[in-house]
């Protein structure tokens, strides 16, 4: 099963006036049903998901939090790319990445696995997960999701 690495801020939660992002519940259902999901967030860089679940419990109902317990932790220190198995088949969903992280992806021929979320488009999160499920990475994705 393809891996899906997830950030929280800017993906599942909005970055301003924090709340659940538009489409987040549908996104979570689709992601958990179709991918092996991993947290790739500053809230869980030590391999412990407790802080993530506690944070998300402020914005999502208990049944969603129970489902989110299936998302696996990652460990990384400086760059999020340290927490990604770059040899695996994966997507990385985030709203912002550092240039150094893009360079790691480029060096490993994985830049196309990065998908940036645009919270200014209320349908963006659900549209992107549906596209990932239906199309995979068989070519260029139909949106400007990173800078090459």
Language model features with spans:
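C-terminal cap/substrate-recognition subdomain and adjoining C-terminal extension
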Residues: 50-148
């Amino acid at each position: 099963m393809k891996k899906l690495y997830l950030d929280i801020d800017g993906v599942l939660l909005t970055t301003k006036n924090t709340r659940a992002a538009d489409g987040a519940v549908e996104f979570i259902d689709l992601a958990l049903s179709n991918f092996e999901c991993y947290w790739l967030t500053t809230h869980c860089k030590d391999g412990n998901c407790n802080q993530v679940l506690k944070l998300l419990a402020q914005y999502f109902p208990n049944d969603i939090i129970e489902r989110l317990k299936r998302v696996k932790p990652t460990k990384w220190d400086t760059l999020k790319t340290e927490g990604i198995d770059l040899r695996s088949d994966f997507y990385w969903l985030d709203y912002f990445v550092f240039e150094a992280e893009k360079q790691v992806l480029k060096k490993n021929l994985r830049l196309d696995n990065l998908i940036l979320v645009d919270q200014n488009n209320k349908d963006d999160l659900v549209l992107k997960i549906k596209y990932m499920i239906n199309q995979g990475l068989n070519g260029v994705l139909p949106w400007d999701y990173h800078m090459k």
